[in-house]
Amino acid sequence: MKGLDFGYQKGQQTLRDVSFSIGKGEMVSIVGRNGAGKSTLSKLICGFETPDAGEIFLNGKPLAEENIRRRARHIGYVMQNPNQMISKTMIYEEVALGLQRSGLTEEQIREKVEATLKVCGLYPFRNWPISALSFGQKKRVTIASVLVLDPELILLDEPPPGRISGTIPTSWSSCGA
């Protein structure tokens, strides 16, 4: 990311001259007060918003050349509220949803989904309705739904509930991060 500027209203910049790079395999937290622009930054990376200036790169290629659909092949985005992401009634179905049009066989989908559910500690609940889950468990389902797609970049707009040593989200670390 280089020289990124963005404002929702003309003359009021939310982000000004933001520049940084993240290496493959790195885990980075962007911390700030409410309204500091953390969610805005995620929206810009995903292509939901367009920067006023600057460029965003993924693997050295400018993301401006990619539409939202193509970016989604490379970027997994976990929203703050899992209820805004969940569209299926059962855990297994929700995690499998993103793979349905991937060209994988049903057996390959099953293997990937089950492996991801095991990593995220959700396998015993795979046939449960999502409505039976707590907010934190729903958040884990949305993380699993992103992890199963194996994106190059994963954005968590808000850390999941529960922490280890006050820094690493428990459910994120149990999902293999």
Roles of regions detected by a PLM:
Residues 54-62, 71:
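Conserved ABC transporter NBD signature motif
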Residues 31-33:
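The feature captures the beta-strand-to-loop junction immediately N-terminal to the Walker
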Residues 46:
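Helix-to-loop junction immediately C-terminal to a conserved catalytic motif
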Residues 154-158:
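Catalytic Walker B motif of ABC-type/P-loop ATPase nucleotide-binding domains
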Residues 150:
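Conserved catalytic motifs of ABC-family nucleotide-binding domains
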Residues 129-133:
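Conserved ABC ATPase signature
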Residues 107-125:
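Conserved ABC ATPase "signature" region
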